[in-house]
A protein has these predicted regions:
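N-terminal active-site segment of His-dependent metallophosphoesterases
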Residues: 1-49
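Active-site neighborhood of divalent metal-dependent phosphoester bond hydrolases
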Residues: 43-47, 51-131, 171
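Active-site environment of divalent metal-dependent phosphoester hydrolases
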Residues: 9-13, 38-41, 65-68, 187-195, ...
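Acidic, His/Gly-enriched loop-helix segments that form or flank divalent-metal centers
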Residues: 96-213, 217-222, 232-236
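Generic enzyme active-site microenvironment
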Residues: 5, 32-33, 59, 142, ...
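Short, glycine/charged-enriched secondary-structure capping and boundary segments
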Residues: 17-20, 45-48, 72-75, 156-157, ...
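A general structural motif
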Residues: 25-27, 53-55, 137-138, 179-181
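Divalent metal-coordination and catalytic microenvironments
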Residues: 7, 35, 50, 61-62, ...
Length: 237
């Protein structure tokens, strides 16, 4: 089976609960559509667990990108002194990351060795921007935030980096001509999307035409949602 979740945001408790619920077999695959870290307390623990699992495939989120830009400046030792020694540009990037919820991740980095930080940095750097998956007779394009500046005939490799990371799709938009092709993404909580659509907010997966939004706001007292692509079954913890 092939599964997809997103926006764990440091909720190691939710991550462990999801793994227990799925009981992944070696032949199963779980795609994680970015924003594993930040905001919640234990993003580093989630990443360290993911690194060990060959059948867990990470997709880059904007929070991973922010961390990957900041961590190299802090690799040798994360201390108050090393932070104070940052250049103006680097300090601005670090400040932006912290304002966007990077504090718990930075504290987690302080608790592991430089070697472990380097391993996680390599993991972040090697995350793909998207995956195209065949399951249950359907095609699924998996990204963190949809596809900004969408064009039906545009190849995925021609999109810009931030098109994958910062998009705010309208779930009601029709996209590809192939009605058996679906775009699956996180980034914007489904409660927010539902409110924008004039619906009552709910922390559940939103399916609208060819778009499937799966960020169920687990770090905001919502749920960690997961979709089985083969059966379109929804799992929540």
């Amino acid at each position: 089976m092939q599964y997809v979740c997103s926006d764990i945001h440091g909720r190691y408790d939710k991550w462990c609960a999801l793994l227990a619920a799925l009981d992944l077999k070696p032949t199963d695959t779980l795609y994680v559509l970015g924003d594993v870290i930040d905001r919640g307390p234990d993003g580093i623990k989630v990443l360290q667990d993911m690194v060990q699992r060959l059948n867990v495939i990470p997709i880059l989120g904007n929070h991973e990108l922010d961390a990957a830009l900041c961590i190299p400046k802090l690799l040798q030792e994360v201390t108050d002194e090393s932070i104070a020694a940052l250049s103006g540009k680097d300090f601005a990037a670090l400040s932006e990351w912290l304002q966007n919820g990077g504090g718990p991740t930075l504290r987690g980095l302080q608790q592991i060795s430089p070697t472990e930080r380097e391993e996680l940095l390599d993991y972040l750097r090697n995350m793909d921007l998207y995956a195209a998956v065949e399951a249950g007779g359907r095609t699924f394009v998996l990204t963190h935030a949809g596809l900004d500046h969408f064009e039906a005939e545009k190849p995925l490799e021609n999109y810009e980096l931030l098109d994958f990371l910062l998009g705010r799709p309208n779930p009601r938009d029709e996209i590809w001509h192939d009605k058996n092709k679906f775009l699956v993404y996180g980034h914007t909580p489904t409660r927010v999307l539902r409110e924008q659509m004039g619906e009552s907010p709910a922390d559940t997966i939103l399916r609208c035409g060819q778009q499937i939004a799966i960020d169920c706001a687990c770090v905001f007292d919502g749920k960690l949602g997961c979709l089985c692509l083969d059966m379109l079954e929804e799992i929540y913890v």
